[in-house]
Amino acid sequence: MFKRKSTAELVAQMAKLAGNKGGFSSEDKGEWKLKLDNAGNGQAVIRFLP
């Protein structure tokens, strides 16, 4: 099992990840959102391209 040698190393890695602004953004305009009908149901068609 992997064990960390020091908590300072963990804190440094957490700070590095917290400062990463290039990761997932919830305000992504290209992200597809499912539209729901009045009953709260949604559907999607998945097409596999060759």
Curated annotation (Swiss-Prot):
InterPro entries documented for this protein: NA-bd_OB-fold, Phage_T4_Gp32_ssDNA-bd_sf
Annotated function: Binds preferentially to single-stranded DNA and therefore, destabilizes double-stranded DNA. It is involved in DNA replication, repair and recombination. Binds ss-DNA as the replication fork advances and stimulates the replisome processivity and accuracy.
Protein name: Single-stranded DNA-binding protein
DNA damage found in the keyword field: yes
Keywords, comma-separated and alphabetical: DNA damage, DNA recombination, DNA repair, DNA replication, DNA-binding, Metal-binding, Zinc, Zinc-finger
A molecular function (GO) term: zinc ion binding
Signal peptide: none
Domain of life: Viruses
Misc. comment: Interacts with the polymerase and the uvsX and uvsY proteins.
GO biological process, one term: DNA recombination
Subunit annotation: Homodimer in the absence of DNA, monomer when binding DNA.
